[in-house]
Regions:
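Axial heme c-ligation environment in periplasmic c-type cytochrome domains
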Residues: 1-10, 14-28, 64-69, 87-121
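Sequence context surrounding c-type heme c attachment/ligation sites in exported
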Residues: 7, 41-53, 63-80
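The canonical Cys-X-X-Cys-His
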Residues: 13, 49-58, 113
């Protein structure tokens, strides 16, 4: 499809698409997202799961060079990353911080948090 475009056409398309604002993704299940909001802001009582916001910020903006931005990540991606931490397949977290947190989270906790994060901006 793009093979027939001239170099100028490609530049024009690039200029056009670079001005487009991404549409925010919203949670598909609002009840799940509300549960995720509670976990994100307050952790899971009695399990040792801290509030995500304590490291990643109240809006998921992160702290550069320390804790990554989470806001706006797709729910499937966030869930997959939490699960790889839980399984020990991902190990780029200093002092095993995320691995120890994810190990204490249920599958439902992870899905709820992922759903909430998707709607953050």
């Amino acid at each position: 499809m793009v093979a027939s475009l001239s170099p100028q056409d490609m530049l024009n398309l690039a200029a056009y698409y670079s001005t487009q604002k991404p549409k925010p993704d919203t949670a598909k299940d609002q009840v799940l997202a509300l549960t995720g909001q509670k976990i994100f802001r307050g952790g899971v009582q009695g399990t040792g799961v801290p509030a995500c916001a304590s490291c990643h910020g109240p809006q998921g903006q992160g702290i550069p060079a320390q804790f990554p931005r989470l806001a706006g990540q797709h729910a499937d991606y966030t869930y997959a990353q939490l699960n790889t931490f839980r399984l020990g397949e991902r190990a780029n977290d200093p002092a095993k911080m995320m691995r120890s947190i994810a190990a204490k989270m249920t599958d439902a906790d992870m899905k709820a948090v992922a759903s909430y994060i998707q709607g953050l901006r």
